[in-house]
Amino acid sequence: MVDHLLPVDETFSSPKCSVGYLGDRLASRQPYHMLPSPISEDDSDVSSPCSCASPDSQAFCSCYSAGPGPEAQGSILDFLLSRATLGSGGGSGGIGDSSGPVTWGSWRRASVPVKEEHFCFPEFLSGDTDDVSRPFQPTLEEIEEFLEENMEAEVKEAPENGSRDLETCSQLSAGSHRSHLHPESAGRERCTPPPGGTSGGGAQSAGEGPAHDGPVPVLLQIQPVAVKQEAGTGPASPGQAPESVKVAQLLVNIQGQTFALLPQVVPSSNLNLPSKFVRIAPVPIAAKPIGSGSLGPGPAGLLVGQKFPKNPAAELLKMHKCTFPGCSKMYTKSSHLKAHLRRHTGEKPFACTWPGCGWRFSRSDELSRHRRSHSGVKPYQCPVCEKKFARSDHLSKHIKVHRFPRSSRAVRAIN
């Protein structure tokens, strides 16, 4: 079947196609063009997947396989068996014959691809990468490393900022004068200013500092204060140290006013037990200063401080002053000032509309009170005798009757 197609004296040199090479070609899922083989010119249905042509025809070894599978392996075996049959019949062409005119290298050089395909491979630049502008595409590992480095930097900066704030507060409090607590023998405690200073702790720092447009800061200072035991009390226990109890004195500076929170020592009911707790005043109360700039003695547990001038905005509440000569009254509302000026001018714009009544008043509340005399309405009632009055001042006078009975008043008049 094959001899009549292939002359005996014509030699077919088969390149040595190793099994590994065929496997690589099969593994790469790329379509290749198949050349018609002289073996498949007959009416047989099986076409050879790999054909070796002569150098004149410039053919090459091609593997006709879409992917590794049992069909591809079967086609390779059929091709090998057909080549073995040709080698045994002709005696001149075999798979293992190495005397062919075309060697493996020359066959590789003479191979010409029939089908052109374009592949996009990544370009690896050997030069400097900074010269070429390309988008930055970080990997997940690089992103994680970047986030970890930033978090570590923030954690390191946080304690540094906190320490800076503490240093700033300490510098502000260090420049201020501090009050010292001197307990007395009777158990009372007083707060005295330091020599050469008239203000409490924290007042100097608030006054000397630059004025800010924002909210006024609140400075807190804690000072250790030695509190001795009261006179007449013996040692609490034999093992107790003779040193006194140390508590903290709190200095508060709020809007330019400094307060010192004085501790209050609560004596223990049982002298055999040591006093471990010191109670401080629950509610701070600002005491008025006594004398020129000096702080007077205050009761234990109270908040004693120097009172600074009030805000000038509070003095502007009564800004409407009477301009009549000899009158110095001031009012918070302009309407009240106008009603007051009518008393000086004698103007009475509010007239009673009751028939036959020509009374006029300078204030509207006086007119309302006058109308009750015509209508008979008495909205003010005595809670004791349930007597009603049209005016509130009449009710106030009536209540005095119940406080001082007539009999007692008569007795006092006789005496």
Curated annotation (Swiss-Prot):
Disulfide bond entries: none
A Gene Ontology cellular-component term: nuclear speck
Biased composition (Basic and acidic residues): 181-191
Lineage, uppermost ranks: Eukaryota, Metazoa, Chordata, Craniata, Vertebrata
Main location: nucleus
Tissue: Expressed in aortic smooth muscle cells.
Family under the similarity heading: Belongs to the Sp1 C2H2-type zinc-finger protein family.
Descriptive protein name: Krueppel-like factor 15
Subunit composition and interactions: Interacts with MYOCD. Interacts with EP300.
Keywords tagged on the record: Activator, DNA-binding, Metal-binding, Nucleus, Repeat, Transcription, Transcription regulation, Zinc, Zinc-finger
